[in-house]
Amino acid sequence: MFFKPREPRAATKGVDEIVAWFNRPREPRLDAGRALELYNTLLPRVSFLKMLPPAARVADIGAGDGSLSVFRRWPAPERPDLRMHAYSIEKAPLFDEYEGYEVSDWNLAPPGFAGLSFDALVCAHFIEHIAKPASLAAWAGEHLKPGGRAYIEWPSPLSLDLPPRTVLEAAGVPLVISRFDDDRTHRRLPDRDAMIRALRRNGFRIEVAGIIRLPWLEEELLAHFRDADDGFPRQAAFWSYTGWSQYIIAERA
């Protein structure tokens, strides 16, 4: 079963706990720029991209606004050698920074990329939007070269029972999203064990799977950016604090 029935989970964080965490005093240890740089160095999605082999060809599936392309140049090490191809349901302005792109509705017609084979796949916050998450594993098995690696990220079960965004905002914690169903385009939450089985059926070995947590950096981000106009660092700290996202890294045999 790809979507498990609801069952007891680790206790999620409630409104009072989140508000107390958000408002507690903090003293930064880094300057603001360095805190952002370090966050985007240690985030598993970016570190995966940065450590790919020289001249790797990368499929960015569910590329959104195309911001993954920014990480070729920042932070260090620069990776202008990466050959990146974007896929989404519609074109974003940053898609022109890629070597190529394709747009379609995955549920009707996944991308073909003119028959290209890839050294790596990055798929972040996409499988919770499609009808059959296992179809990504099948696509990766067909389009990644032997030894090619896949990074897949999506919300964790801990996101399901968080307070709604509107409740946290009323309590003084402004966010873009809190609970999984704050985003009405989300379908049901794909189960990690089922995704691992789908990858194995399609010829992949699992390297690592887990929850994304960066506790020290979430404190740095809030020390600098809790009340900033740019809400992304605040949101990133919340995602880390709540264990909002999970990921898998797998290698095609």
Segments (PLM) and residue ranges:
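Conserved N-terminal segment of class I S-adenosyl-L-methionine
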Residues: 1-116, 120-124, 137, 210-214, ...
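S-adenosyl-L-methionine-dependent methyltransferase catalytic module, highlighting the catalytic core
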Residues: 6-10, 14-17, 21-25, 131-140, ...
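Short conserved AdoMet
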Residues: 53, 131, 145
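Residue-level signal for threonine
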Residues: 92, 145, 158
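Short catalytic micro-motifs in class I SAM-dependent methyltransferases
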Residues: 125-129
